[in-house]
Amino acid sequence: MELGQRFADRRAAEPCEAAPTANMKEAAPTANTKDRLTRDEGHHLLTDAPLLEVGARAAEARFARRPDKVVTFVIDSNPNYTNVCVTDCQFCAFYRKPGDREAWTLTVDEVLAKVESAATKGATTVLLQGGHNPALPLDYYLTLVRETRTRFPQVTPHFFTASEIHTMAQVAGLRFTDILDRLWDAGQRTIPGGGAEVLSTRVRARIAPKKGGPESWLEVHREAHRRGFKSTATMMYGHVETVDDLLDHFDAIRELQDMFGGFTAFVPWSFKPGNTLLEKWIKQYKGPNMYLRVLAAARLYLDNFPHVQASWFSEGKATGQIALHFGADDWGGTLFEENVHKAAQYVNTISVDEIVTLIREAGFTPAQRTTEYEILRTY
């Protein structure tokens, strides 16, 4: 059956409702689920459906949800506070074990200097992540949040992935929900979606066994959304996963989004094997065709996600422009600083002026946004 026939009657979901406030405990469905895509249809999108038709359908879904031609971006930076990690992920070239001569950990003041540097360049978001360092006390993290909020009120502290939050809890002898409560009290309101990789038990056991199964990531975001946090959902594909694993990932985050509507965007990117333990088996990362297929399929399958991000940094600027015609409505960030992909021998840089130019060249109107997708300026 042709793709157009398969999805002729599909309609984009209504816009997501607001995420619940901190005291809301009941589920808050965010989409009309009666006519959403099935796993079989998702499998078709990710395998044998003609790529350009998948892209065209995804573009229709994008404009059904957001009729204007605005493409947003955020001015941000992505520094790291430590490369010390005890998790030994097979895909990571960035980490060093405790005691390694190349291991480092920044002081609170050194991290805040990076936040200040980003703020002086106009950043409104700092995405701060690091390794799982058992030597760092909980107060280190809470101080970073409080000081960022106090000293740089224009900057959103988009700090600490789910696995880092689990590490904080283990070191402090607390529950991860206690950590979420303390981060909230310190002033944090958003959480990055990194560390999801592919939410498949088989895949995570192969590439990141010490991180636990999919639930270890999902439970943090579930409880964060219950408390009123917003977060992103990411996916790093192109290593040991199958199409069924990708669909497991889609199903898991779609189901969680039905509960609270706390995800602001879906952000996929391809694995970069350079300098990693997986490099011996995976010599080359996936190309643009696979990226565009995954992106477009996500726009169609994740009917309750308000935004899909074009990962220019990992996939290249030209692919980022094409992604805007395959369902993406957000360009991502400036990433003034980024070290994880750099460690895998993959480097890409961009300026605000270049972002504006690239979005316009693709036929869209650029608009600067906040972490939570509020428009600050239209160009």
Question: What is the role of each PLM region?
Answer:
Residues 141-153, 174-186, 242-260, 292, ...:
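Short, electropositive alpha-helical surface patch
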Residues 71-77, 126, 157-161, 191-193, ...:
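Hydrophobic faces of well-ordered beta-strands that scaffold small-molecule active sites
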Residues 1-16, 23-52, 60, 113, ...:
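Auxiliary Fe-S-binding modules of radical SAM enzymes
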Residues 55-98, 103-129:
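N-terminal pre-triad scaffold of radical SAM enzymes
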Residues 123-221, 225-231, 239, 307:
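Conserved SAM/AdoMet-binding glycine-rich loop
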Residues 34, 58, 89, 128, ...:
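Conserved, mostly hydrophobic/aromatic
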Residues 73-79, 96-102, 127-139, 201, ...:
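Glycine-rich, proline-tolerant flexible connector loops at the mouths of alpha/beta enzymes
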Residues 77-79, 132-134, 161-165, 195-198, ...:
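Active-site-proximal loop/turn and secondary-structure-junction residues that shape catalytic pockets
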